[in-house]
A protein has these predicted regions:
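A glycine-rich, basic-preceded beta-loop-alpha segment at the flavin cofactor/substrate interface
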Residues: 67-68, 188-199, 208-235
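N-terminal glycine-rich flavin-associated loop
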Residues: 81-104, 130-133
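A short, Trp-centered hydrophobic/proline-enriched beta-strand micro-motif
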Residues: 116-125, 168
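Short Ser/Thr-interspersed hydrophobic loop/turn segments at strand-loop and sheet-helix junctions
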Residues: 49, 72-77, 168-169, 186-191, ...
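A short core secondary-structure module
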Residues: 146, 150-195
């Protein structure tokens, strides 16, 4: 079996590294030292097809797949891990939208990621549970045609710079844990959301990391990703 990269992937690898050297290296030290997030780098990367590369072309991506996205991540990270995350993780959380969302959700959220104009956050980790998905406590309770969300998320990548987030919430508390969670799209500017940037990280400081609090945050039930009660598996 031939494991060598195709010529197209080799070109992608070279282009990603050259982009990192020309656009990221000059500001790397400053961004790391001062915890600075530069959206213009993300937008320039998007113009070169480096953002949301794993997303199919029909939704605005370059269609490079997981392998192509991995190559981009490796090459940019050689220069700076933090700024690399700003580029390749700007769609973090959208994997669930692509895999389980409705066609309307895909068309509404994915193109903006690929163009570099929008940023998503995966609002999963919680203070009490870390990345133990079964231990999350954030609740989403139905009220009419909406969900009302209450809870806290911690160490959320893109937390203060995102335009929307995909949040893991308990929607079916009466079910066993693996059947109790759902993924819900939440606009970052929704009333009741508080976002606080986490300062003083030991590394990857150019990447935005935040604590997010939900207090009676109301979103329509149409923002449910996939099926209710399937969030544990989808994540």
């Amino acid at each position: 079996m031939n494991f060598e990269l195709t010529e197209e992937m080799k070109m992608l690898k070279d282009m990603a590294y050259r982009f990192a050297v020309s656009e990221i290296k000059p500001v790397s030290q400053e961004c790391d030292e001062h915890e600075k997030y530069l959206p213009e780098i993300r937008k320039k990367a998007a113009q070169n097809g480096l953002v949301g590369a794993w997303i199919p072309e029909q939704y605005g991506g370059s269609g490079a797949g997981i392998l192509g996205n991995t190559i981009i991540t490796e090459e940019i990270s050689k220069i700076d891990m933090g700024i690399s995350l700003n580029v390749v993780a700007s769609g973090f959380g959208c994997e669930s939208i692509l895999n389980y969302g409705t066609e309307e959700q895909k068309k509404a959220y994915l193109p903006g990621i690929c163009s570099g104009e929008k940023v998503c956050a995966g609002a999963y980790t919680e203070p009490n549970a870390g990345t133990d998905v079964a231990g999350y406590k954030t609740r989403a309770v139905k009220d009419g045609k909406d969900y009302i969300i209450n809870g806290n998320k911690m160490f959320i990548t893109n937390g203060t710079v995102c335009d929307f987030m995909v949040a893991q919430c308990i929607t079916n508390p009466e079910e066993k844990k693996h059947n109790s969670f759902s993924l819900i799209i939440v606009p970052a500017d929704a009333k009741g959301i508080t976002r606080n940037k986490i300062h003083g990280k030991m590394g990857i400081r150019a990447s935005d990391t935040a604590e997010i609090a939900f207090e009676d945050v109301r979103v329509p039930q149409t923002n449910l990703v996939g099926k209710e009660g399937q969030g544990f598996r989808q994540l």
